[in-house]
Every structure is written in structure tokens, then in C-alpha cells.
Amino acid sequence: MGTKNNSSDKVYITDKKTLKEFLEYERQKYGRKNARMPLICIGERSYLWKYNVLLRKTEYYVNTGNKLMGTIYRIWLARYQNKHHIHIPINTFDRGLKIMHLGPILVNGNVRAGKDISLHINTSIVAGGTNNGAPVLEDGIVVGVGAVILGNIRLAKNIAVGANIMDPRV
């Protein structure tokens, strides 16, 4: 139960305990006082935290097979993604995902990302146009503003992808 630690495997939140662990870990990264989703968002950090909670709760309800709540949260997440242009599919990032600023972020559903990944605005992590391979991000990666990571590539642990980089070989 819980998550798989290998970055190339899918990440699953399959029980309430794992959901709480994810949210508590990410709450500390965002500097929030509690792990609850804010009802009224004031400031950029509130919107980002709300997105993070929606993403993780959607993962939980979909992975546990709760069709009603899974559908409700998928719709809620999709509306929030379209409103704020942050498109991160469920079950792609391990715990510790931190979005630095509101703005366009696009992630392919086949991407596998490890723990403690930071994403800046205007980033794309997508499959290449000529193959079906999607990037694999190891633990502790910071993706800079405007970076594009594409194709069948594996990024090492604890690196930073520079701002406005667009190279499939990074």
C-alpha cells in the first residue's frame, strides 16, 4: 500500500494514511499552518496550496475506487487546472511537489517524477513528437522558468534545469 519509491514507477496514494503523509510533507514545503484546503484564497500561495490539495485528494479518490468522489474531484481539479493553466495529471509526481508561482505548467501523463520536485512557471515536461517516451525525473529536481523537457530522457537526482532551456538531451 502507499507509494512506490522508484521514480520510473507510477506513484499511487492508496490509503488515507498515505494521503495525510503527502499533504503534511507538502504543507511544510509551502509553509502552511494546517493541511486543510483554504476556502477563500488570498495570495498566490493559497491558490497553489489549494491546487496541491485538489491534486492529491483526486489521486486518493481515483486510486481507492470511490467513483462518486473520484468524479467530483476530477471535475473540480479540471476546472481549477483550466482556470490557472496548471495541467499536472494525477499519479505523476511523488510527494514533495512544489509549484513556485501561478502560471502555465504542462506535464504529460506518462511522466514519472520522484520526490521534492519544484516547478516554476511556463514549464513543459512532455513526450517528444517522434516517439512515445516521456521524461523521468529523479528526486530533488528544480525546473526553471520557461524550461521544456521533452522526449525519452532521464534526469539525475538533485539537479536544476535552467531557465528557458529547450534541449531534449538536457
Predicted regions and their residues:
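Terminal amphipathic alpha-helical/low-complexity segments used for targeting or macromolecular assembly
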Residues: M1-H84
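General structural signal for secondary-structure boundaries
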Residues: D15-T18, T130, R169-V170
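Conserved NTPase motor "head" modules and their coupling/switch loops across ABC/AAA+ ATPases, GTPases
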Residues: H85-P89
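Left-handed beta-helix
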Residues: I90, R95-G96, M100-G109, G114-K115, ...
